[in-house]
């Protein structure tokens, strides 16, 4: 007898578990199941045919892949979560009997989760962990600003603060910071670590305000925080040893004073959090970083067309690392201390602040060697002539443009220029005019400081990158010009062939041989512009030799005259119609299995065009309003002068 195939026992119907079935399989409640999935990186799946995956049901359910649930069955943490359930029941039982000693003993023996093997399992290589460092640092920086609550414990907030300070010290020592930006969400930082870009957000330092429970589930965020603290500890350890720094961080010199005698650990942690001290190195060197030597490419640029761009980018990054070298900054009390200290230290500058503001100040406000004082107030009573009083935005804009900007636009009380985001694409559809001006200024400086590569093959002609890659618009114009020229030449040839016989009959027999030869050459030559100009020059020379009275009359055929060509201009309406027809044709040529993806790409392009158009219109309205306000202001000033 043939074995019968039952429905939903194979194929897509046997590939998925619902969340309830997965919890029953693992014998866990919803809280532990969520925590386990977060730690292991298991997420719900979307089946191709939901009705088949749910055994005929069309209800929207959370589905997990059967292989993922089978993978969780072999996880040792599952046993720890089950033991926690038993301990929770025993602790409640001891508290109900008011046996506090037994309750404390069971709390002390409460099973702890060990996540080391999960970190190694999810990130087999160190570069894989660096790629996932964005969310890790963003969450830890947020937890470091939280107070201790019932869910977010004090131990988690302290560990988050320690790990973030250690990470900032590494970025300072490695000079890895590349981009900074201020937004309503916080401070954006982007660093280049081991060839990977890491972007994280530091929230603004405002007082903590509790939220409603339905807005954010802090228990889920705590699960992420527990995993990210273990992960960040491993990463900081590897990063510190990669640049020969001692981990955990220590001071490069001893601090024997009355303050350290009381609580040395607290004193050292505060000084490290100040971000203003050099850390101890394992190789015994000082904190000064040596400038890396740029190796010149001695081969042909034809083999690697982007060598010049790579070389220029390396030079720009090398200059950026020492942007604030030789400058001394002093921070006023009203400006945010930690982000500014972090940025200035990353680019080689020296910084200090008021001693009553935070520990770790190295010089006072009265120091005459201070070059810049960062303030955020309209005016100050006492000012020093030897320094510039600037607003904090100058530091951020100088880093993003990779040059020291003029300070006159950032003076105390001045209206600041727009703060442009560095996280934009070069091929963006809308670019603000201020950003275009900044790009032109940067390109002008790069042209002044050109780099001359080593010449090895001087015999071969060097072709620059601009010559190799032609502009598509210029190429199209050249093609249009060539087509129009060919059309005019063909039309002139046809006219000449029809009038050639009549021109031969009209020739005069009394002309001399020189005029006949000139006429024959004129009839036989082509109608190219260059050759006609040569013939005209020869004719003018002969006319100068002959007397004025014997000047011959030219009997060239009328068809030989050069006519001015008309410039072809496209009709915008017809062009739009043709573009729509081509787009419809491309959509028909897309295969059925790729149509959904193609429609998404088309919608994305339309959305980008719409956003660019809206931004351009908004900018135009703002500029128009500014001009109207300026005109109104000028009118009022004129009235006041006349009055």
From Swiss-Prot:
Its main location: nucleus. Residues 492-518, 609-635 have a biased composition (Basic and acidic residues). It comes from the Eukaryota. Residues 464-475, 524-544 have a biased composition (Acidic residues). It comes from Anopheles gambiae. HAMAP family: Pescadillo (MF_03028). Keywords: Coiled coil, Nucleus, Ribosome biogenesis, rRNA processing. This is Pescadillo homolog.
